[in-house]
Amino acid sequence: MIGKSIKFILIGIIVILAASVVALQLYHRTSSTRTRSDQEYLALLKQVVGIVKKSYVDPVDEKKLVKGAINGMLSSLDPHSVYMPADSFKEMQVSTSGSFGGLGIEITVKDGKLTVISPIEDTPASKAGIRSGDHIALINNVPTRDMNINDAVSRMRGPKDTKVILTILRKGSDKPLVFPLIRDVILVKSLRFRTLEPGYGYLRIMQFQARTGMDLATALETLKKENGGTLQGLILDLRNNPGGLLDQAVSVANHFLGDRRDNSLIVYTRGREESSRHDFMASIGEKEPPYPIVVLINGGSASASEIIAGALQDHGRAVIIGTQSFGKGSVQSIMGLPNNAGLLLTTAKYYTPKGRSIQAKGITPDIVVENLVLNGKTNLESTPFREKDLEHHITDGTKKPVGPEQPEKPLSPAQPLPLAPSQKPDDSIKPIDDIHVPPKTLTDDQVKQDYQLLRAVDLLKGWELLKKAAKNK
């Protein structure tokens, strides 16, 4: 009996060893095939470059050819992965670290056309009436068809008080619209706030920057003091918010999610490399009281702003009102290259707490409300377009990602989530005291003309009335 058992064990060991040898051989064969395939493609590229250099009708610059090959390779992946030569990489660092002269537009490329994702509030572009979805046909009479984003950005940036003429194609307009714009120093404010009516606060976040979380805390305290120490409801306006720093989006959500016992999941990212796998959790501690919250979004709400809307929606902490958001659910990493160049490469996608991919889908409002003028006929969101409309956009995929894991630390370090490589969040933010200037934040006349905002106020009031009605039963 013992002899038979030993015999079976030996046979099992032999089978396992044989399988291991076969698997190892297959691995080396696959690895060898992959290496040989890579070498063949590189040899083909080298051959084509050689033929072009030798036989093209005019002399060619080899450096230009290589850059073109790199740009072609990256543009075939997705709209957000780009190669940045030294000058463009330096421009990006300038826009990340301080003020710069420009127009205040977040841009991308759609079907070869330079397209506005959203104008940034209180910049020359927004003041002139540039809208989300506008196609920029000409910059100073230079056609932009198939123009590289970095080239477009460099043409629109420049010294303060200098002139730029944009020719815009807009859906619904019979002829091109010409916008003479004067460059200004772009100092993007993080947020603004005011009391709309007694008990009801309004807080608009324009972009997630290095101080957004701290500014939000100060704004909430100020609103509560203005309203007798508590709020009956809050409207969080994320319309035309192009995104920004991931850790600040997490910080904002952290004020409203979790409690002294629960560290709720806010968002998680998944990519091919282990370094791209992160779970972002709310910290355990005191949170805002459970007053009702309405979040406003539209087609210009992207990236980090979609994280907030998705997290609050999944946890049932807020009602989302407006139109479908942009659908930018991918994470870009910045990598340095030789000769001071850089690479912006998509390395992960992010997912809401319930595992929803935002990529190319966006956040669907709980209540769809178009942005109409008060006669109810005109939709101010003139050309709604989304991430899914961009050429070579990344799909959301058919498989669900591996679920969230316990994070090493809550509130992980800042990770930029750029919507388009046009400009990154500006860290030079004015103090909160400079931001809270009610006449400049949102006037009463502006409130009366904002149909989506009025619907949000009605919902909060109705919420309170329904609670009172339920108590009286």
Please report, for each region that a protein language model flagged, where it lies by residue:
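Flexible, low-complexity junctional segments that flank or bridge functional domains
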Residues: 1-234, 240-244, 262, 417, ...
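C-terminal "post-core" interaction segments
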Residues: 5-14, 18-20, 25-28, 39, ...
